[in-house]
Amino acid sequence: MANAYKQAGVDIEAGYEAVSRMKKHVQTTMRKEVLGGLGGFGGMFDLSKFALEEPVLVSGTDGVGTKLMLAFMADKHDTIGIDAVAMCVNDIVVQGAEPLFFLDYIACGKAEPSKIENIVKGISEGCRQAGCALIGGETAEMPGMYSTEEYDLAGFTVGIVDKKKIVTGEKIEAGHVLIGLASSGIHSNGYSLVRKVLLEDGELSLDRIYGRLELPLGEELLKPTKIYVKPILELLKKHEVYGMAHITGGGFIENIPRMLPEGIGAEIELGSWQVQPIFSLLQEVGKLEEKEMFNIFNMGIGMVVAVKEEEAKDIVRLLEEQGEKAHIIGHTVQGSGVTFIEGTEV
């Protein structure tokens, strides 16, 4: 049977075209340590230049979750790749690791070259922001598994850190200051609830601007996850950081305790940073309690670092010089978990 594979739903020629179109984007992420080119059976990365006493590789993997469904609805695919990279590199930089390279996995119902190119364009942008190379990936056309408009996106990153410089959180003590780095919005967690509250129950339109939003709802919801790698690595060069938390699924309540040693809790001062309007809209339309919001969403803070009190203001200044919006949002205390206290509105 001629073109049997194509008749089964797999278009090999479209796959070749997609690879050809993505190469120019991938090339912009290259580092001098990358060996070989795109299309080999494996990606290679030379570690010999890293003059570390005890080099440790740190890896992280993640996906974008149901935020992808917003990309399908809006037919916008050029930024969702940034989210895939961000979710991985932010997870390893909190341990002090410099991301070295990234590999992606795209599974789709139909390999449309222009759509695949746009996805990889976003992945490449995320890699540039993180300073890591996109050294490989896989695009799997899976008719029958996904509809022709659907795809899933995941990836993983590998980074490196000297063993003595790993940030573990084990030295955090009561009285350390917590600094929050602003998020760009919802990032990549909680989108099943977002869709239910705003689109299904609230019947809001992706094309309209609501409340204090500055963008149409669809654009607001598709804002890419902020990548904190470069400012955090710069911070680690100049100050001691005792612990870091990437505020992802589970919000403040689940993620901040992940960096804290036993017997230490966190006290967060409400009002010490600006909560973006999208969270207020979600809470209002969904009639969600504040505690539930903090247990699901980042609430405007995408990364939290624990530092000594006497260095806190200098660190905020350094982060702001790196282009970050940084705020002192609380401190560590004897105890456990996360508690919230009322503060002064910023």
Curated annotation (Swiss-Prot):
Pathway membership: Purine metabolism; IMP biosynthesis via de novo pathway; 5-amino-1-(5-phospho-D-ribosyl)imidazole from N(2)-formyl-N(1)-(5-phospho-D-ribosyl)glycinamide: step 2/2
Catalytic activity: 2-formamido-N(1)-(5-O-phospho-beta-D-ribosyl)acetamidine + ATP = 5-amino-1-(5-phospho-beta-D-ribosyl)imidazole + ADP + phosphate + H(+)
Gene Ontology biological process terms, A to Z: 'de novo' IMP biosynthetic process; adenine biosynthetic process
Subcellular location: Cytoplasm
UniProt keyword annotation of Nucleotide-binding present: yes
Keywords for this protein: ATP-binding, Cytoplasm, Ligase, Nucleotide-binding, Purine biosynthesis
Database matches in Gene3D superfamilies: PurM-like C-terminal domain, PurM-like, N-terminal domain
InterPro entries according to UniProt: PurM-like_C_dom, PurM-like_C_sf, PurM-like_N, PurM-like_N_sf, PurM_cligase
Known EC number: 6.3.3.1
Main subcellular location of this protein, as a coarse class: cytoplasm
Top-rank EC class of the record's enzyme: ligase
Record has Ligase as a keyword: yes
GO molecular function (one): phosphoribosylamine-glycine ligase activity
Pfam families: AIRS (PF00586), AIRS_C (PF02769)
Family: Belongs to the AIR synthase family.
Protein name, as recorded: Phosphoribosylformylglycinamidine cyclo-ligase
Species: Bacillus mycoides (strain KBAB4) (Bacillus weihenstephanensis)
